[in-house]
Structures are given as structure tokens and as C-alpha cells.
């Protein structure tokens, strides 16, 4: 699964295989925790990311949601700037 961003120990990835991976989403991994977030409404689909890490992921998503949606639609992965 390609890593598209890394910040504060949080790994953001994106992977899809046609309709098998809908709805559009990204997994976020922090240590042994993982959550999946919708690119449609930025709501957590599932997972157990700690609250502090989840807030950072959502803040980052707000800044880059258009890029994330474009990447999902085009299936063209690139690195996105980390949260600073």
C-alpha cells in the first residue's frame, strides 16, 4: 500500500483496486493502531487510532482533501506534504 504522507509518527496510505475498495478512503496507522477515514465526508469508517492522532489526521485531511480526492479519482499516487 503506497504511503502518501508521514507526520508525527502517523502513516497515511492509499490503495484501491477498482470498485473493491469503495467508498473512497485512506487508512492512517499510528504504532499498533489503525483507522480508516472516508474521503467523502472525512468521518472515521472504522479503527482504533488514539484521539490525539485522530485529531492530527483530520486536521491534515482538511488541508489536503481536494488532493486526496483527485488522487483517488486519477489513481495516480504522489507524496503529500506532512502536517507541521
Give each language-model segment a name:
Residues 55-84:
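C-terminal structural segments of small proteins and small subunits
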Residues 7-13:
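Charge-dense, helix-prone N-terminal extensions
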Amino acid at each position: 500500500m503506497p504511503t502518501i504522507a508521514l507526520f508525527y509518527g502517523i502513516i497515511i496510505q492509499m490503495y484501491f483496486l477498482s470498485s473493491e475498495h469503495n467508498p473512497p478512503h485512506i487508512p492512517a496507522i499510528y504504532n499498533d493502531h489503525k483507522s480508516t477515514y472516508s474521503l467523502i465526508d472525512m468521518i472515521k469508517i472504522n479503527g482504533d487510532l488514539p484521539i490525539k492522532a485522530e485529531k492530527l489526521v483530520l486536521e491534515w485531511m482538511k488541508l489536503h482533501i481536494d488532493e486526496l480526492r483527485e488522487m483517488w479519482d486519477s489513481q495516480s499516487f504522489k507524496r503529500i506534504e506532512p502536517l507541521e
